[in-house]
């Protein structure tokens, strides 16, 4: 994997979280495999490469890659507008989080507790989702910038859906942080679209 593909893998995680949030908000449906992949990504320590954070297989990220390709190609027929908005908002929130050592400290201390729950219940268990959602609510949701999620109010008002959305936003922002640590910058999404697409298409084909 090239350094750019390492970045795109992490960015695929941001977009996967965004796609899953949009689906829950609009339909109330959850992709359990995607949810498990993203919640699991919060807890990976010492991965051998970026893909290892997401279970070691590009197929886990294919919905995120698809949304990212749609955003980079700027084709109205494939552009997923709400997921793109959520993804860009997560990239923005990560920048705010990076300036808050106190918040990073809280997240760093609580993730090992969530890891213990995962070992006991599994990654997509309601207790784990609730704990991740609560961590988002106690930290990132207090920042000045907020992510407004649009969808069917009946879905958004269900406590289990609200927890899943918050947990996915937490995981998406973790992926945004990883993308940044790998050298990702927002200007690349505008200036280097063709280069990114050239590196991204093979990741989709590796399904």
Swiss-Prot record:
What Pfam families does the record point to?
DUF489
All disulfide bonds of the chain are: none
Tell me the compartments it is located in.
Cytoplasm; Cell inner membrane
Alphabetically ordered keywords of this record: Cell inner membrane, Cell membrane, Cytoplasm, Membrane
Query: Is Cell wall biogenesis/degradation given among the entry's keywords?
Result: no
Source superkingdom: Bacteria
Bilayer disposition of the protein? Peripheral membrane protein
Principal localization?
cytoplasm
* Single GO cellular component term: plasma membrane
State whether keyword Cell membrane applies.
Answer: yes
- Secretion signal: which residues? none
Report what the protein is called: High frequency lysogenization protein HflD homolog
Write down the species.
Pseudomonas fluorescens (strain Pf0-1)
